[in-house]
Amino acid sequence: KNNKLEDIYSIRTCLDVESNSRSKSKIWHLHGDIDRAKSISLGLNHYCGTIGKMDGYFKGTYEYTLNGKKVKLDALSKKLRGEVQHDGISWIELFFTTNIHIVGLSLDYSETDLWWLLNRRARPLNFNTNDIINEIIYYDTEIDETKASDKKQLLEAFNVKYIHIPIDNEKWDKAYMRIFDMIEHSKKSK
């Protein structure tokens, strides 16, 4: 089920999926989806607009309209300190509260919104990083070892676990099945 809550940005929009075991998950297309063509992040203007929305989410100035009524969310910092409940309205919160597995995303340096968020999460000035107990894992299928090494160093500086699964002879499907198996195994071991 797709809850298409926004036209341009993808702060609150997700896809609710149910697996064979009846467990429910949400898939967040952070940079838009084909069903909402205007939501696809193309260009600096869109990425910077997303950063503005994320900054508002942090500060408690993020607002939206639901059923004709304005809704204003509490600051993320208050949620992280336990002053108010997490509402699960956005994927932004999840970067601080639950394990995240990033798959199928090049995480190119032009994706300034995600780099901004990872930087914000890693900065001890904004939060007591000891309170952030979740793990972010990035699975990289980059073939170029130099690019992979550079990205690994930067991600690790942002407290992101980096796992390199190179695509062998362009057999991307096997690489992704291996990644999905690793994710499934990590869920069972907790």
What is each of the regions a protein language model found here?
Residues 1-3, 15-23, 82-190:
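SIR2/sirtuin-family catalytic core signature
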